Each structure stands twice: as structure tokens, then as C-alpha cells.
Design a protein with these regions (language model features):
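Non-heme Fe(II)-dependent double-stranded beta-helix
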Residues: 1-97
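A short secondary-structure junction signal
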Residues: 82-88, 96-97, 116-122, 131-135, ...
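Short, conserved beta-strand element in jelly-roll/cupin
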Residues: 96-115, 162-165, 170, 194-197
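Conserved double-stranded beta-helix
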Residues: 129-170, 174, 180-257
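Residues that flank catalytic or metal-binding motifs in active/ligand-binding sites
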Residues: 32, 42, 70, 102-104, ...
């Protein structure tokens, strides 16, 4: 899906951010994991990932043409990282299950992801499950503490997303999954754009994460995805006006329509 040159460009754009070596703050983020958030504001190469035709086609088919980019982040698992708690990505809206997905997640493999280096684990068919909590699922304490062992959540029905560098996997937001344990001697890097229906609040506050002067230089579809758009009939307006009109007024010389 991604050429070696594109993968190299992504690595180069991420390098200064990964060099800071900021590790996760809790069990969910991962004590031995780098997470780089707000990628849309950091390099045009990440906007290109968010609007990649195949990923976007899945998002629009599942979520509608007014879908939004909920988050865009890099996840870099270091050797020794343990398994993440089980979770599903569109849980933030707290709409009871079973239900249609309110989001989808794309997983771009920048490194080869293998059974040994922390390939994402998924439970096939779990997007159809009801609201029962499974063994090893994320709990509120996972966002406040480090050091928990979620190995008791291992399941015979789970599979690992083994993917060569440059490949793409897409899952519904209702699918139970978790980051795997990295038992190798090298980090494992992926980038995950997450999309949501146009009426659900985004995980990342894109209005603050992507300054207007940066948004004005993005491709038009990327601007729409971060919120310079309208969910019918008028959700997302600014003082009764389409947000793209205000962006043109605030950055008229930079806007690339």
C-alpha cells in the first residue's frame, strides 16, 4: 500500500518526535510505548495518510460522507512492552451495544509487525457482541496506574495482525482488540488514523491540535475531516456560517482550495 519512499518519509517526519522518547503515562498508553499525538499538525505526510483513498473509502462507506478524523497518532512499542488491556475504539460515546460502529480504525504498519514484536491482537466477530465486559478489558484504573499485568486476558479466539511494512488493516470501532507484547529486540511502529461519525465528539480536539494557519495549508478533504465541515443539516457551523468560510477569511493567502 505504501511505497518504501513514503515509509521513509514517514519515519523522517516522526524521528524528532520519537527522539524525545516520551513513554506512556499509564497502563493503557504503555509504560514502554511512545505515542505521538496530533500528527495532522506535524507534517503533510500524515495528512496524506488520513485521506488515503482506500482508508477513506472504508470510513465514508461505514460512517457516511460527513465522517470526521477522530485521532491520528503514532504508536511505537519498545522491547519489553506488555499486552495492552482489551478495548474497542468507539467506546467514548457510551452508546449501548450491540449497535452499528460509530467509528473505524486504520492501522498502517510502518515497521513489519510480527507475532513477536507486538502485532495488534483482534477478536474476530467481537464487533457484533453485546455490552458484556470481557476478561482483561480496560478499566478506569488503567488510565491512572502503571504496572498491571493483562496477560490474564489471553484468548484462544484472538488473532494477531501480522503485517509487512507499508500495509494497512481496517477494523470497525466496535471490534475488541489490544496492542500485543513486544518480545523482540526492536521497536514496532504503526500509525493509526481513527474516524468517527460526524455527530460524535472526536478523541483529539482538532480545533486546538491543528492551528488555523496549519489547517489552511492542508488538502481540502483533510480540512473537512478535522472539522472544517458540516454534518447535515448544520452541525458544526460557526455563527451560522460554514467553517471553511471563516478559515478563508483568517488565512486567505495560505489557503489551498
Amino acid at each position: 500500500m505504501l511505497s518504501p519512499d513514503t515509509v521513509a518519509d514517514i519515519r523522517a517526519a516522526l524521528a524528532p518526535h520519537l527522539a524525545r522518547d516520551l513513554k506512556g503515562r499509564n497502563d493503557f498508553e504503555g509504560e514502554k510505548t511512545n505515542r505521538v499525538y496530533a500528527l495532522m499538525a506535524k507534517s503533510p505526510v500524515f495528512a496524506d495518510l488520513a485521506i488515503h483513498p482506500l482508508a477513506l473509502a472504508f470510513a465514508e462507506a461505514e460512517l457516511g460522507p460527513s465522517c470526521l478524523l477522530s485521532a491520528l497518532l503514532a504508536i511505537n512499542l519498545h522491547p519489553g512492552e506488555t499486552v495492552q488491556p482489551w478495548h474497542f475504539d468507539d467506546n467514548g460515546a457510551k452508546v449501548p451495544r450491540p449497535r452499528p460502529a460509530l467509528g473505524i480504525s486504520a492501522f498502517w504498519a510502518i515497521d513489519d509487525t510480527t507475532e513477536q514484536n507486538g502485532a495488534t491482537e483482534i477478536i474476530p466477530g467481537s464487533h457484533l457482541w453485546d455490552g458484556d465486559i470481557i476478561q482483561g478489558a480496560v478499566t478506569p484504573s488503567d488510565f491512572a496506574h502503571k504496572g498491571a499485568d493483562h496477560g490474564d486476558g489471553d484468548r484462544a479466539d484472538a488473532i494477531k495482525l501480522v503485517m509487512p511494512s507499508g500495509s494497512l488493516a481496517i477494523t470497525k470501532g466496535t471490534l475488541w482488540h489490544r496492542g500485543g507484547a513486544n518480545r523482540s529486540d526492536r521497536p514496532r511502529l504503526i500509525i493509526t488514523p481513527q474516524y468517527c461519525v460526524g455527530w460524535v465528539r472526536q478523541l483529539e480536539n482538532m480545533a486546538l491540535a491543528v492551528p488555523a494557519e496549519v489547517a489552511s495549508q492542508l488538502p481540502e478533504r483533510a480540512r473537512e475531516l478535522i472539522g472544517y465541515s458540516i454534518h447535515p443539516p448544520f452541525m458544526g457551523h460557526v455563527d451560522g456560517r460554514h467553517p471553511r468560510k471563516l478559515l478563508r477569511e483568517h488565512a486567505p493567502r495560505k489557503l489551498q482550495a
